[in-house]
Amino acid sequence: MYNPAHPGRILVNYLQGRSVTEVARHLGITRPALSRVLNGKARISADMALRISEAFNTDAEFWLRLQAQRDLWFASRKRRAKVKPLAQDLAA
């Protein structure tokens, strides 16, 4: 698996010359909040995914999947205790 791009890097392409301030106002969020997403400093929340999907005529699930892929990639690289599989005794 590779290091998936932050959804904010993809969102930048949707701005199409619009200012961050203009898009933030349109989304109903602050400019710093949008800047954090665009710069990869903040995650895409469900609320943000809905706002983006409505503004750019995309699916909220698309944005959430991008975020989930990135989250899983980072989580898979963290050290954590091994988890043993649960016994699956269906004969009982």
Regions found by a protein language model. Give the residues of each.
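A short, Lys/Arg-rich alpha-helix, primarily the initiator
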Residues: 1-19, 61, 65
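Short alpha-helical DNA-recognition segment
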Residues: 17-36
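Short amphipathic alpha-helical surface patches that mediate protein-protein
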Residues: 28, 39, 57, 68-69
